A protein has these predicted regions:
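Generic helix N-cap/helix-start motif at coil->alpha-helix transitions
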Residues: 241-242
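"Short basic amphipathic alpha-helical interaction patches in structured regions
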Residues: 15-16, 263-266
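Beta-rich, aromatic/charged-enriched effector core domains that present basic-aromatic interfaces
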Residues: 1-102
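Single conserved hydrophobic/aromatic residue that forms the stacking wall/gate
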Residues: 294-305
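Alpha-helical support elements that line or immediately flank enzyme active sites
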Residues: 248-252
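Structural helix-adjacent loops and short alpha-helical linkers that scaffold large soluble proteins
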Residues: 256-260
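Catalytic cores of enzymes that engage adenine nucleotides and/or redox cofactors via long glycine-rich
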Residues: 57-237, 253-254, 265-289
Length: 306
C-alpha cells in the first residue's frame, strides 16, 4: 500500500519497532524518530544534549507575555453554504456556529501555520500546560485539525518549527515540545491504534460502566473548571490537552464513566478528533482502560498537538 504523507512512520515500520520491545514506551519511539528524521539532532545526539524538555514546559501564565491576536478567515461561499446547512439540519445539537474560525482551504491552513510560528511558538513551550480562566487558546497552535485532515503535512510543520529554532526565533524547549507532539505522540498513538484494532476499541480494564452525565452535552454544571472546558469546547470545537486530559477526562476516570461513552463524546465534539488518535488517548491516557498498553515516561500525560 502507499504510504500516507500525513505521517512520518508507516504502519509496517511501527509494527517492526513494536516487535522489538515488551513495553511500548513512547519516549523510545520518539528518540528513534528523531534519529530517523534528523530533527533537532547533531549526528546521533540531540541538540542541547537532552531529548526531552518537558520539565521546562510547565509555567503558569499570569498575563505576560501578551497573548497573540486570534487569526480569523473570511468565509467563502462554500463555507457559508455549509454553515447554513448545519444550522438548518443540526440546530438542536451541542455547539455553536457563531465563532467558527477554522481554515477550510490549504492556503489558509498555511497562514495558520505561519501565524503560530511567528506569534505563539516562542512561548508555546513555557505555557503549554497552563490553564487560565477565559483564555481559550493561550499559545497553542490550533493546527491539529489541519494535520489530521491533510491540509497541512507534518513534515512541513516540523520543518517550520525547526527553522524557527535555527533562526533564534523560538527557544529549544518550545520547538522540541512542539515537534515531540507531532513526531512522537501523534505517530505513536496512530501506530498503537492500527496495531491493536479492532479488539482495542472494546477494552475496559477497570470495568467502568457509569453513564456519561448529561452536562457533558449541555455544559451546565457548577464545577467551574468543567464549565470552562465545556464553554471552550462548544464555542470552538477545541480544548487543549490539559483541559481534555486533566479536567473532562479526569472527571470521567474518577466517576467510573463507561470508556466507550466518553470516547464517543470526544469523537463528537472536537474538530481534530479522528478515531485513530482519539481512541488511544481516551482508553489509554484518560481512562486507563487499555491494560496499561500505552506507556509514557513523562510525569504529565497529554493529548497531542494542541
Amino acid at each position: 500500500c502507499l504510504n500516507d504523507e500525513r505521517f512520518f512512520c508507516s504502519l509496517e515500520q511501527f509494527r517492526h519497532w513494536a516487535s522489538r520491545y515488551q513495553t511500548l514506551r513512547m519516549e523510545y519511539f520518539y528518540r528513534e524518530m528523531r534519529k530517523q528524521t534528523g530533527y533537532l539532532m547533531q549526528g546521533q545526539q540531540p541538540f542541547g544534549e537532552q531529548w526531552n524538555y518537558d520539565s521546562a514546559n510547565r509555567k503558569a501564565w499570569a498575563g505576560n507575555p501578551p497573548l497573540p491576536a486570534p487569526l480569523h478567515f473570511e468565509h467563502d461561499q462554500i463555507d457559508l453554504d455549509v454553515l447554513e446547512l448545519v444550522e438548518r439540519e443540526f440546530s438542536r445539537n451541542s455547539g455553536s456556529l457563531d465563532n467558527f474560525r477554522w481554515a477550510t482551504t490549504r492556503s489558509n491552513a498555511l497562514l495558520a501555520l505561519e501565524h503560530f510560528i511567528i506569534h505563539s511558538l516562542p512561548h508555546f513551550g513555557d505555557y503549554q500546560d497552563a490553564m487560565v480562566q477565559d483564555s481559550d487558546i493561550l499559545f497553542h497552535s490550533l493546527l491539529s485539525p489541519y494535520l489530521n485532515c491533510g491540509l497541512l503535512l507534518p513534515r512541513e510543520v516540523c520543518n517550520a518549527a525547526e527553522a524557527a529554532y535555527h533562526a533564534s526565533h523560538a527557544p529549544l524547549n518550545a520547538v522540541e515540545g512542539f515537534i515531540r507532539q507531532i513526531l512522537g505522540w501523534r505517530e505513536y498513538v496512530r501506530g498503537i491504534y492500527w496495531l491493536y484494532m479492532p479488539e482495542y476499541a472494546n477494552r475496559n480494564a477497570l470495568q467502568y460502566s457509569a453513564p456519561l452525565p448529561q452536562f457533558y452535552w449541555t455544559g451546565h454544571t457548577r464545577m467551574n473548571c468543567m464549565a470552562e472546558c465545556f464553554r471552550n469546547t462548544f464555542q470552538h470545537a477545541y480544548a487543549h490537552h490539559i483541559q481534555r486530559l486533566m479536567v473532562t477526562g479526569n472527571f470521567a476516570l474518577l466517576t467510573g464513566i463507561d470508556p466507550q461513552q466518553i470516547s464517543e463524546w470526544y469523537l463528537a465534539v472536537y474538530a481534530d478528533a479522528y478515531e485513530w488518535v482519539e481512541l488511544p488517548n481516551t482508553l489509554g491516557m484518560v481512562m486507563h482502560a487499555d491494560l496499561s498498553l500505552i506507556h509514557i515516561s513523562e510525569p504529565t500525560r497529554r493529548t497531542p498537538i494542541s
